[in-house]
Regions:
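Fe(II)/2-oxoglutarate oxygenase catalytic core
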Residues: 1-151
Length: 151
């Protein structure tokens, strides 16, 4: 396990086909702030939806059972400003590992993202990919982030 600038990179077993997946820890205080935001903003919560081409977002509990709050990339309220700073640190470390991606376009968070709570037995129960429903836009996406806040 190596460390860089306060970030901890968790080394995974060596694999024969590079999958470009890396993991880092986001500081506990930032994660706690996101959880607190979710808990304190009940009016923003909604049932999780599945995005289907031609239908948009539909609630299908057999496919996905969650409670979500959608966060706009322009939401610079606490704790999301600190979270984005940490994501940028992770991206900077990722670029050091895979420098060829820095030759491509600049990276930024352009899609809304979700804070999702899955009840016991809930979750995404079918195969899916992470996308925002604008199917053609995501064809060229080359980096996805997920932050798990469970203990």
């Amino acid at each position: 396990m190596g460390t860089n600038r306060g970030l901890t990179l968790h080394q995974r077993p060596i694999i024969t086909n590079e999958d470009f997946i890396q993991t880092w820890h986001i500081p506990e205080g930032i994660c706690d702030g996101i959880l607190e935001y979710f808990e304190n903003n009940e009016k923003l919560r909604m049932n999780g939806v599945c995005i289907e081409e031609g239908k948009g977002g539909v609630i299908e509990k057999d496919a996905k059972e969650s409670t979500d709050i959608s966060i706009s990339p322009s939401n610079m309220n606490q704790p999301f400003m600190d979270y984005r700073i940490e994501l940028q640190k992770c991206l900077n470390e990722y670029i050091k590992i895979y420098p060829h991606i820095n030759l491509m376009n600049k990276f930024d968070i352009v899609e809304s993202y979700n804070i999702q709570h899955y009840p016991v037995g809930g979750g995404f129960k079918v195969e899916h990919c992470e996308r925002d429903g604008t199917f053609s836009k995501n064809i060229k996406r080359c980096l996805v982030f997920m932050t798990y806040l469970n203990d």
